[in-house]
């Protein structure tokens, strides 16, 4: 599911930063006569991360609206807990004086940071993105230990994929199913690509945007039934995890077809995803407006659940979703979600690649999840993530530049008792990807 996905990603991937004044190299020193807005804001980032500079003095109102101070502090506290305090900014570079990259050194690692400084008069930061961490003498064992220490439950798999074979390189709880949020949309993409390969549909087919949903970055406030192509829906569903696009495709393709594709792709417990819920149906059942239906749904078998969904189609709609209930913390992530194990995701990625669909692979690669630095060792890098309160999942499919081999890196973290830290988890996955690239 994706209740807070975009905001959480904004708080980590829109974390654009700058280096510390005391440690800034001469080219970006804030006192330099030729210092730019980027240089000046970069020179303050260590103090911002360490809590020594006021949040509203550094970030523009647009950033503050997307990432409130409390969330920013929670996120940076997680980074500091994992990597130590920020100590220096290095290798700061901007081509235009406003947007650029830098390395932010912590006590236990180095982060790659993308920073956008605004214009006059105050030049406050409008974008901040930490794209990954490097750690000296890193290893799969070290990352595995840190993943094991996360509160709740977590698992991961790093594997070479060759044809239909999965060759694990490093793993923990890879056969255990986790709630994976919007990662379920890979099954929708797989079925769409399969139907197009079979000649049933074309990527250029135009269909109405028949179903709207929450957390829809692309289709928010769009008129219902706006005509769009199937390729556009797929691109939106994968690259920005648009829920309206996903629900439109689920209704178009049909639950039965997607469920059959999920089974064929090797999901180890497909009953947990049967019936295959739309995002609106899941939101509605998780919320406070359908407490009676939720109890019946979670207690029922597949047939009973399908009957309940079909029989309440006129009730389980966007207008009846209680959004307020999602503000406090995790909601029924063990029983009302979409589920897959790291092994399941690896098999799904194999199934998707087997389609030979240029369009499906391109959709996966629009947003690689970890930024350009993490992607540099890969000639292809596709990504799909998922999140809601208490749930984080990140899955990548890459072809290594060095030898042309294909790899899957996938990890999931669930905590039914508390929200999970996007920045910490993304850093761990970035390290797994970097180790797989070697």
Task: Give residue spans per PLM region.
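Structured C-terminal helix/loop/strand segments within mature extracytoplasmic catalytic/sensor domains
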Residues: 24, 132-150, 322-438
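Short solvent-exposed beta->alpha transition segments
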Residues: 43, 48, 53-96
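Exposed beta-sheet edge and beta->alpha loop/turn motif
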Residues: 94-143, 424-433
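Active-site-adjacent helix/loop patches that line small-molecule binding or acyl-intermediate pockets
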Residues: 225-317
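Short, glycine/proline-biased beta-turn/loop segments that scaffold the active-site neighborhood
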Residues: 198-226
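Beta-lactamase-like hydrolase cores
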Residues: 131-177
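Short, low-complexity N-terminal intrinsically disordered segments enriched in polar/charged residues
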Residues: 23-48, 137
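Active-site SXXK
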Residues: 178-207, 409
């Amino acid at each position: 599911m994706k209740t807070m996905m975009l905001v959480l990603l904004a708080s980590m991937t829109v974390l654009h930063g700058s280096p510390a004044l005391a440690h800034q190299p001469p080219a970006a020193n804030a006192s330099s006569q030729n210092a730019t807005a980027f240089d000046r804001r970069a020179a303050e980032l260590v103090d911002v991360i360490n809590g020594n500079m006021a949040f509203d003095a550094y970030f523009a109102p647009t950033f503050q609206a997307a990432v409130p101070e409390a969330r920013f502090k929670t996120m940076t506290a997680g980074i500091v807990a994992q990597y130590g305090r920020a100590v220096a900014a290095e290798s700061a570079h901007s081509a235009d004086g406003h947007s650029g990259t830098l390395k932010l050194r912590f006590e236990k690692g180095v982060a790659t940071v993308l920073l956008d400084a605004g214009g006059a008069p105050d030049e406050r930061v409008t974008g901040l993105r930490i794209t990954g961490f490097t750690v000296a003498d890193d290893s799969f064992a070290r990352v595995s230990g840190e993943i094991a220490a996360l509160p709740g439950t977590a698992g991961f798999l790093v594997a070479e994929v060759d044809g239909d074979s999965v060759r694990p390189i490093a793993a923990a709880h890879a056969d255990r199913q986790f709630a994976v949020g919007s990662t379920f949309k890979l099954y929708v993409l797989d079925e769409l690509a399969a139907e197009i390969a079979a000649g049933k549909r074309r990527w250029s087919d135009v269909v109405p945007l028949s179903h709207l949903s929450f957390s829809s970055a692309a289709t928010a406030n769009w008129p219902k039934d706006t005509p769009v192509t199937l390729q556009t829906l797929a691109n939106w569903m994968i690259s920005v995890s648009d829920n309206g696009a996903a629900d439109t495709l689920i209704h178009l393709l049909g639950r039965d077809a997607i469920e059959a594709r999920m089974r064929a792709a090797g999901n180890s417990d497909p009953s947990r995803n049967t019936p295959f819920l739309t995002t609106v149906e899941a939101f509605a059942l998780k919320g406070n407006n359908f407490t009676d239906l939720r109890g019946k749904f979670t207690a029922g078998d597949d047939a009973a659940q399908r009957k309940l969904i079909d029989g309440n189609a006129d009730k389980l709609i966007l207008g009846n979703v209680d959004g307020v209930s999602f503000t406090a913390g995790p909601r029924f992530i063990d029983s009302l979600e979409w589920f897959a194990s790291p092994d399941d995701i690896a098999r799904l990625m194999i199934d998707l690649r087997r389609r030979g669909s240029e369009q499906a692979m391109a959709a996966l690669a629009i947003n690689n999840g970890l930024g350009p630095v993490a992607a540099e060792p890969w000639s292809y890098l596709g990504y799909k993530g998922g999140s809601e309160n208490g749930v984080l999942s990140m899955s990548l499919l890459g072809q290594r530049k060095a030898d042309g081999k294909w790899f899957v890196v996938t990890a999931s973290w669930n905590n039914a008792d508390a929200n999970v830290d996007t920045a910490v988890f993304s850093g761990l996955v970035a390290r797994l990807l970097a180790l797989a690239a070697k």
